[in-house]
C-alpha cells in the first residue's frame, strides 16, 4: 500500500509553486504504512488533493524531497533517464561554448533530482548522494547512467557530512566500470586541469568557479597576484594565462600545491612566474601586512565557513577579517576578487560584510562586478536555495 502524506492547511502553497521540499512541521498526518527511509510517498493537501510524489526522510527536517509534480510519472529507471537527458541538453550547449570536458551534469534540485549531484570528468561520472531518497534510488540511478553513458565509469563520492543529517553513512567507491586513475585531465576555456576524483575536494575540482576564473583574466595582465586558498591552482592558471607578472598560490595542503605546480607545467605556463606557498592564509596575510608586502590583485576564494545556521555569526566574522586583511595588502587601485560559497549567506549579507571589512581596513572600496556559480550549476526558478556561490570584484582605492 502506498503511503500518503497530508499537509497542514496552508503548507501546500510552496508545492503549488513547485518548490521541492516539505518540512517536518508541514505534515499533518500520515495514512498507510509508516514510510521507511527514502521511500517514495504521495503528498496531498489537507483536503486530499494530490500535489506531488517524493522521497521520505524520517531523520531530516526536510521530511520530503519531491521527485515529480506529474501524477503520471513513476520513479524508476526511465524517470532517471528522462531527467539525465534533459540535463545533458543544457550541458551540451555549455560544453561546446566553453570547450568543456568536465562539468556538473546534475545539480540536485535545480535539475529535478533532489539530493543528487553528478560531475562529469571526461569518461568518469562522479556522484554525491546526499539524501535518503537518493540513496534509496541509487541502483535505478546507476542503471540509468549506464544506459545514457555506456562509455563512462561511475564513481561515488558520498563522503560528505550532510549525509549524517539523513541518517546515512559516508561512502565512496566504484558503482560501475573502472577505478579512476590518479588524475583525470579535463579542459575548460583552453586550460588543462588534472583532477583527483578519489582524494580531491568535493568530487575532485571546483567546477562552479569556472566563469569567475575566466572573468579574472581581464584584471591580471602585468599584475602581481595573490591567489589565496588556491587548491590545485585554478585561478592561478587563468592569471598566468592572462599575463600576470607573478602569481603567489597559497594553500595549507602540500598535495594540492604539488598538483597546482603540475597543472601549471601541463599548460606550458611560465612556472618561474609562479610561487607555491604552504601556509595558513590568515597568518600569511598578517605577515605580509606587518612587513609591508603588497599585491595588485588578491583572489580570495575560501572554503565554506558556515555549514549550519549556528555557525553563521562566526562565519561572518571570518569573512570580514580575511577580506579586511586582503584589502590591507592591496596597492592603491588594486583589485580584490572575493567569494563566498556559503549558501546560508545571501548576496546582500556578503556585500555588507565586504563593506564592513573596508571600514576596518580604512580603505575606500567600489564594487565593480558581481559573480555567481557557473552555468552548469543552474538556478531553478522555483528553488532559490540553489543560489549559493556569490562574489565581487572590488576596486580598492
Curated annotation (Swiss-Prot):
Entry's Gene Ontology cellular component terms: cytoplasm
SUPFAM superfamilies: PUA domain-like, S-adenosyl-L-methionine-dependent methyltransferases
Entry keyword annotation includes Signal: no
Reaction catalysis annotation: cytidine(1962) in 23S rRNA + S-adenosyl-L-methionine = 5-methylcytidine(1962) in 23S rRNA + S-adenosyl-L-homocysteine + H(+)
Coiled coil (residue ranges): none
Pfam family membership, one: Methyltrans_SAM
Primary residence: cytoplasm
Keyword Acyltransferase attached: no
PUA domain location: 2-82
UniProt keyword list: Cytoplasm, Methyltransferase, RNA-binding, rRNA processing, S-adenosyl-L-methionine, Transferase
Family: Belongs to the methyltransferase superfamily. RlmI family.
Function noted in UniProt: Specifically methylates the cytosine at position 1962 (m5C1962) of 23S rRNA.
Name the UniProt record assigns to this protein: Ribosomal RNA large subunit methyltransferase I
Lineage: Bacteria, Pseudomonadati, Pseudomonadota, Gammaproteobacteria, Vibrionales
Localization in the cell: Cytoplasm
Source species of the chain: Photobacterium profundum (strain SS9)
Domain of life of the source: Bacteria
The protein's Enzyme Commission number: 2.1.1.191
InterPro entries cross-referenced by the UniProt entry: PUA (IPR002478), PUA-like_sf (IPR015947), PUA_sf (IPR036974), RLMI (IPR023542), RlmI-like_PUA (IPR041532), SAM-dep_methyl-trfase (IPR019614), SAM-dependent_MTases_sf (IPR029063)
UniProt GO molecular function: RNA binding; rRNA (cytosine) methyltransferase activity
Root EC class: transferase
Amino acid at each position: 500500500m502506498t503511503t500518503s502524506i497530508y499537509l497542514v492547511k496552508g503548507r501546500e502553497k510552496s508545492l503549488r509553486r513547485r518548490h521541492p521540499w516539505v518540512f517536518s512541521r508541514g505534515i499533518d498526518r500520515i495514512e498507510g504504512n509508516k514510510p521507511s527511509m527514502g521511500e517514495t510517498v504521495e503528498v496531498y493537501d489537507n483536503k486530499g488533493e494530490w500535489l506531488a510524489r517524493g522521497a521520505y526522510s524520517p531523520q531530516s527536517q526536510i521530511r520530503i524531497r519531491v521527485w515529480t509534480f506529474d501524477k503520471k510519472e513513476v520513479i524508476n529507471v526511465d524517470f532517471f533517464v528522462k531527467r539525465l537527458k534533459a540535463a545533458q541538453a543544457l550541458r551540451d550547449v555549455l560544453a561546446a561554448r566553453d570547450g568543456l570536458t568536465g562539468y556538473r551534469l546534475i545539480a540536485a534540485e535545480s535539475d529535478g533530482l533532489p539530493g543528487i549531484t553528478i560531475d562529469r570528468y571526461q569518461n568518469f561520472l562522479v556522484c554525491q548522494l546526499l539524501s535518503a531518497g537518493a540513496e534509496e534510488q541509487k541502483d535505478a540511478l546507476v542503471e540509468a547512467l549506464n544506459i545514457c553513458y555506456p562509455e563512462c565509469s561511475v564513481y561515488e563520492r558520498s563522503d560528505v557530512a550532510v549525509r549524517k543529517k539523513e541518517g546515512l553513512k559516508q561512502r565512496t567507491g566504484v558503482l560501475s566500470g573502472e577505478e579512476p586513475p590518479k588524475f583525470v585531465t579535463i579542459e575548460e576555456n583552453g586550460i588543462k586541469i588534472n583532477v583527483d576524483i578519489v582524494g580531491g575536494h568535493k568530487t575532485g575540482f571546483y567546477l562552479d568557479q569556472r566563469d569567475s576564473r575566466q572573468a579574472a583574466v581581464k584584471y591580471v595582465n602585468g599584475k602581481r597576484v595573490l591567489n589565496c586558498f588556491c587548491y590545485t591552482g585554478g585561478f592561478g592558471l587563468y592569471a598566468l594565462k592572462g599575463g600576470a607578472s607573478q602569481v603567489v598560490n597559497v594553500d595549507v595542503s602540500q598535495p594540492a600545491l604539488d598538483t597546482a605546480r603540475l597543472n601549471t607545467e601541463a599548460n606550458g605556463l611560465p612556472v618561474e612566474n609562479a610561487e607555491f606557498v604552504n601556509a595558513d592564509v590568515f597568518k600569511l596575510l598578517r605577515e605580509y601586512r606587518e612587513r609591508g608586502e603588497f599585491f595588485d590583485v588578491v583572489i580570495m576564494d575560501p572554503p565554506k565557513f558556515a555549514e549550519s545556521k549556528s555557525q553563521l555569526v562566526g562565519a561572518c566574522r571570518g569573512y570580514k577579517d580575511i577580506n579586511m586583511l586582503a584589502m590591507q595588502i592591496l596597492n592603491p587601485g588594486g583589485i580584490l576578487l572575493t567569494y563566498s560559497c556559503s549558501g546560508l549567506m545571501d548576496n546582500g549579507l556578503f556585500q555588507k560584510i565586504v563593506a564592513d571589512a573596508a571600514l576596518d581596513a580604512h580603505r575606500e572600496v567600489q564594487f565593480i562586478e558581481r559573480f555567481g556559480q557557473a552555468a552548469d550549476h543552474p538556478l531553478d526558478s522555483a528553488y532559490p536555495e540553489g543560489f549559493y556561490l556569490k562574489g565581487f570584484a572590488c576596486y580598492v582605492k
